[in-house]
Amino acid sequence: MKIVTAIDSFKGSMTSMEAGQAAAEGIHRVDADAEVIVRPLADGGEGTVEALVSGMNGTLQKVQVTGPLSEPVICEYGIIESTKTAVIEMAGAAGITLVSDEERNPLNTTTYGVGEVIRDAIDKGCRRFLVGIGGSATNDGGVGMLQ
């Protein structure tokens, strides 16, 4: 039997791939001969880059950008070279997981770093952009990234 698992992440506890691997282990307990393929899945927030880059044979990039509280963060994004497309998660540069519970205040956060990721992708030849906007710690309507 051939089975594909594609499970979204469980915020704060498991990545998409960890959840898929857990399901695969459970399937193998019942049927040791099953062929289980684990694929990442995301809804536009955390895990979107991993899912799309994996499925579209892209490459991962890392760039230091301004985080949601104006501190430096390393943001990972993807490039699909065949279409010059960048795959970006707002969560990577301005995500809620980058802000402690005590510091969560949308009046103090920015999407500026998302714009820096876009600039890096442009510098690497990208002309198309897929931007997942889930998992954000911001409420600036994207004004920060336009700066």
Locations of regions flagged by a protein language model:
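N-terminal loops that bind phosphate or other acidic moieties
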Residues: M1-Q147
